UniProtKB/Swiss-Prot annotation:
Domain comment quoted from the record: Contains a C-terminal catalytic domain, and an N-terminal region which modulates catalytic activity.
Gene of this entry: cheB
Enzyme class of the recorded protein, top EC level: hydrolase
UniProt cross-references to Gene3D superfamilies, sorted A to Z: 3.40.50.2300, Methylesterase CheB, C-terminal domain (3.40.50.180)
Domain CheB-type methylesterase: 159-345
Main localisation: cytoplasm
EC annotation from Swiss-Prot or TrEMBL: 3.1.1.61, 3.5.1.44
Designated name of the protein: Protein-glutamate methylesterase/protein-glutamine glutaminase
Transmembrane feature ranges: none
Protein location: Cytoplasm
A GO biological-process term: chemotaxis
Length: 349
């Protein structure tokens, strides 16, 4: 595997090169700004690029756009943990970056705390589907809002969506197509660090008909609202006296992640029984497989994103293999399937 390392800091370039080389990954070259990055990407055709966002001459976002147009390559962004960093990182994911690693704060460049994560994400990026990068670039996806035939609402139903690597772009193909009158709350669990999920919710809210917000502890759940699990916490729901409230809880990671789709799924099934529509999108690992099976076994309906429209097919594949999936659909048809499945649930006697 051949990697191009791009950062305006010589210390960061050295640190990243050192981490990757020790893991047996070849660093073919480094670049100190976006302009160099584009030139070297075209010339060297690396398997993966690590890319800083804030650089002189040409920033990372501009470079990323050009690379995606001229030489689509899996890119892992190195970003800061600031609010601005979170916003720029989401923009990078939208443009086509595969994933990101947050650089620890501080003047000293110590990347040892993220070394394992960096290696894992670079290795995963190398195996991602470039067809999916191209699919995102085409942006053919933004269809109309899907209208449902709800008539009178007969029962409490909810929607749960789980995603990881490639998830923000996938969610942009689904959430903006859900109608404002959707007769259910939508719970979204996207694997992300603290701070990033708030930015994700704000971004989705600005392009959607439904309200999208980061979930808050103890808030009462309402239909037509999309609740995004806060990064670094698990999101549960509890029903008491026929009122459903959100519980944002700390605790150990589950499936090595926090928030975990499985944790939310478990509580959703306790609160809603089989009146759940679940969807599992692109992502690495197996989080959500158990949760989708749980929903399906209780009589809920579940959807997995098809392999050819997943950046990483890990989570949907695990859910399918476990027998937890009712229907497999391309990501740009999942909004329709969610609405159709809600109609089925509402019409069940």
């Amino acid at each position: 595997m051949r990697v191009l390392v791009v950062d305006d800091s010589a210390l960061v370039r050295m640190a990243v090169t050192d981490i990757l080389t020790k893991a047996g990954i070849e660093v073919v070259d480094t670049a100190k700004n976006g302009r160099e990055a584009v030139e070297k990407a075209l010339k060297l055709k690396p398997d993966v690029i690590t890319l800083d966002i804030n650089m002189p001459e040409m920033d990372g976002l501009t470079a990323l756009k050009l690379i995606m147009e001229k030489q689509p390559t899996p890119v892992v962004m190195l970003s800061s943990l600031t609010k601005e960093g979170a916003r720029e990182t989401l923009e990078a994911l939208k443009i086509g970056a595969v994933d990101f690693v947050t650089k620890p704060d501080g003047a000293l460049v110590d990347l040892s705390s993220v070394a394992q994560e960096l290696v894992r994400k670079v290795q995963m990026a190398a195996s991602t589907s470039l067809n999916v990068l191209r699919l995102q670039n085409l942006k053919k996806i933004k269809g109309e809002v899907v209208r449902g035939n709800w008539k009178g609402k007969t029962k409490d139903v909810c929607v749960l969506i789980g995603s990881s690597t490639g998830g923000p772009s996938a969610l942009e193909m689904i959430i903006p197509r859900l109608p404002a009158d959707i007769p259910a709350p939508v719970f979204v669990v996207q694997h992300m660090p603290p701070g990033f999920t708030k930015q994700l919710a704000e971004r989705l809210n600005s392009i959607s008909e439904v309200e999208v917000k980061e979930a808050e502890n103890n808030e009462r759940v309402k239909d037509g609202v999309v609740y995004v699990a806060p990064g670094g916490y698990h999101m549960k729901v509890r029903r008491a006296a026929n009122v459903v409230r959100i519980k944002v809880v700390d605790g150990e990671p589950v499936n090595a992640v926090k928030p975990s789709v499985d944790v939310t799924a478990d509580s959703v099934v306790q609160a809603y029984g089989g009146n759940v529509v679940g969807a599992i999108l692109t992502g690495m690992g197996e989080d959500g497989a158990y949760g989708m099976k749980l929903i399906k076994d209780r009589g809920g309906l579940t959807i997995a994103s098809s392999e050819d429209t997943c950046m990483v097919f890990g989570m949907p594949k695990a859910a399918i293999e476990l027998g937890g999936i009712t229907s497999v659909k391309p990501v740009f048809e999942i909004a329709e399937e969610i609405v159709r499945f809600l109609e089925v649930k509402l019409n069940e006697r």
